[in-house]
Amino acid sequence: MELATEPIEGVLLVDKPQGRTSFSLIRSLVRLIGVKKIGHAGTLDPFATGVMVMLIGRKFTRLSDIMLFEDKEYSAVAHLGTTTDTYDCDGKIVGRSKKVPTMEEVLECTSYFQGEIQQVPPMFSAKKVQGKKLYEYARQGLSIERSFATVRVDLRLIKYEYPRLHFVVKCSKGTYIRSIAHELGNMLGCGAYLEELRRLRSGNFSIDQCIDGNHLDEPGFDVFPHLRDANGLILQPTPVL
């Protein structure tokens, strides 16, 4: 029995390496498989790692808008005592504090991030205001008024050893984890920025289902055994009877 030759399409789950942009991984996949119709279900900043849901072929790229609305889960590290303009480790340092919060203070502040909260998007973000992305204003040295957005979060403290505060958070679409780190710093009175971020889950897809993103730069790497359907099941080749 032979296997039918079909167009390459499906969901490819990739563990994005640190230092890579999401779009550089898409370009690597385009070069590897020769398919230009590739989308995703949510980008990650260059310093972040973890689950990237890559959608291959027209049938699956059409699912992008649906998958973007699904909940996500992250592990993160907030660095206390220092503030940056971008709220993360890639930004310019704009403040320092010598205050060392107590565990009691940390527990009280982290307990706030449960259920629905109001969050303001950071200036260094792709959120559009008056037709321009916020980071375009920020790069011009401008800070403009931004509207609050209601997001849903479930934050769990993992470990606190000053200056690092480790936590895991499940959240709804549109949640900025670096804004959570920044707000934690404000609440604790010492400032903070997001030092590490790893996406553990995106919708039904988890990190243990992902392939190493570095494989996409290996000539001849076979993606077929790793393609999944929209429910996360491995796709099986269609036999020719």
From Swiss-Prot:
This is tRNA pseudouridine synthase B. It comes from the Bacteria. Responsible for synthesis of pseudouridine from uracil-55 in the psi GC loop of transfer RNAs. Keywords: Isomerase, tRNA processing. CDD domains: PseudoU_synth_EcTruB (cd02573). It catalyses: uridine(55) in tRNA = pseudouridine(55) in tRNA. The keyword tRNA processing applies. SUPFAM superfamilies: Pseudouridine synthase. Pfam families: TruB_C_2, TruB_N. The active site is at D45 (nucleophile). One of its GO terms (molecular function) is RNA binding. The keyword Flavoprotein does not apply. It comes from Chlamydia muridarum (strain MoPn / Nigg). InterPro entries: PsdUridine_synth_cat_dom_sf, PsdUridine_synth_N, tRNA_psdUridine_synth_TruB, TruB_C. Belongs to the pseudouridine synthase TruB family. Type 1 subfamily. The gene is truB. Its EC number is 5.4.99.25. GO terms for biological process: mRNA pseudouridine synthesis; tRNA pseudouridine synthesis.
